[in-house]
């Protein structure tokens, strides 16, 4: 059972579901633990020592790379992010793994811009909902504002634009389906994963 602060993920995390040996975590920062991805401390069987500096990503790809899923926490700010995105893309593109790769670039915020499209209804996750950890009573039955995503792969036709509704649960949903695992929540079970791309 994974936990973040006092909130417990009754169904575990995507790392529990896939298994630690299939996942690799990178972050642009290296050094003291305080600079590491804070949520790592909440993921069962994953710790700060499992987060590797992004500087070693390209060299790791050149070796035998056994990981089916790689999560990269980027730098913050547009200039740094653009540089890191290019570096990550080029590392994957120039590796022997390119022909079997899918690079998904997501954003966790919409940038503060007005969105004329109201958020539609969403399938609530269906996992444990404890009002004690949700003082505003949000039940996750509505999506938030739209955020962009970029999907890059030799398997996707260049210039493809997809208007299908996806959400942040589409990534772990795709992973569970790809690796033949049970979804963590109802939302993951029903999330779009881009099969038509």
Predicted features and spans:
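N-terminal pro-sequences and low-complexity stem/linker regions of secreted or lumenal proteins
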Residues: 1-197
């Amino acid at each position: 059972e994974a936990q973040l602060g006092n909130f417990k993920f009754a169904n575990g995390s995507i790392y529990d579901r896939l298994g630690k040996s299939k996942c690799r975590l990178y972050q642009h920062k290296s050094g003291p633990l305080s600079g590491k991805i804070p949520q790592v401390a909440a993921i069962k069987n994953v710790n700060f020592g499992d987060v590797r500096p992004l500087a070693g990503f390209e060299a790791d790809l050149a070796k035998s790379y056994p990981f089916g899923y790689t999560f990269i926490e980027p730098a913050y700010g547009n200039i740094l992010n653009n540089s890191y995105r290019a570096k990550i893309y080029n590392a994957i593109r120039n590796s022997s793994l390119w022909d079997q790769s899918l690079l998904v670039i997501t954003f966790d915020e919409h940038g503060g811009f007005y969105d004329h499209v109201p958020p539609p209804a969403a399938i609530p996750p269906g996992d444990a909902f404890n009002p004690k950890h949700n003082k505003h009573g949000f039940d996750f039955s509505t999506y938030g504002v739209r955020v962009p995503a970029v999907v890059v792969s030799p398997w996707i036709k260049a210039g493809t634009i997809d208007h299908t509704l996806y959400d942040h649960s589409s990534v772990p949903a795709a992973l569970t389906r790809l690796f033949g695992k049970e979804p963590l929540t109802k939302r993951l079970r029903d999330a779009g994963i881009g099969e038509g791309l």
